[in-house]
Amino acid sequence: MKIAGLKQLNTALKEAASGGFSRQASRWLEECGQDFLEIVQSELISTQTIDTEKLLSSFEKGAEDNLWIVQSGGLSLEVGTQLDYASFLNDGHWTSKQDVRWVPGRFQGSRFIYDPAASTGMALKRKWIPGTGYWDHALLLYEQLFEKSLESKLRQWLKKL
């Protein structure tokens, strides 16, 4: 009895067992991480969340404040930013922990000049700053893309067997 393609299947299975599949999966996962970071950056721009480049660039692999952790032989990837204020911009935040806070200083025309030694000043009320949801929206977009990408990649890997 002769089975067509058995030799190729055997070779492909040996390659997969020797770490070939793991290397391919690791490479694909890294590409997925890059894709997600690009979507986050697009969301930061489209929601007008940023006013400096620090947050935007922290979502680039290898950049200062970027989070890129590969584990389990490349089959686990954690991406993001190490900037504390990133979550405040996504979720929203209060301007202060206190309901009202005193800021010493004086007014010069319509401008307020901060002066820690001044006996005059102004009282600032606590205010809620709504978040833009840039991360949450990027995650929703990416989940849809990831599902299609995973399906396609699995079909591609299975065809090679």
Curated annotation (Swiss-Prot):
It comes from the Bacteria. Pfam families: HK97-gp10_like (PF04883). To B.subtilis YqbI. This is Phage-like element PBSX protein XkdI. The lineage of its organism: Bacteria, Bacillati, Bacillota, Bacilli, Bacillales. The gene is xkdI.
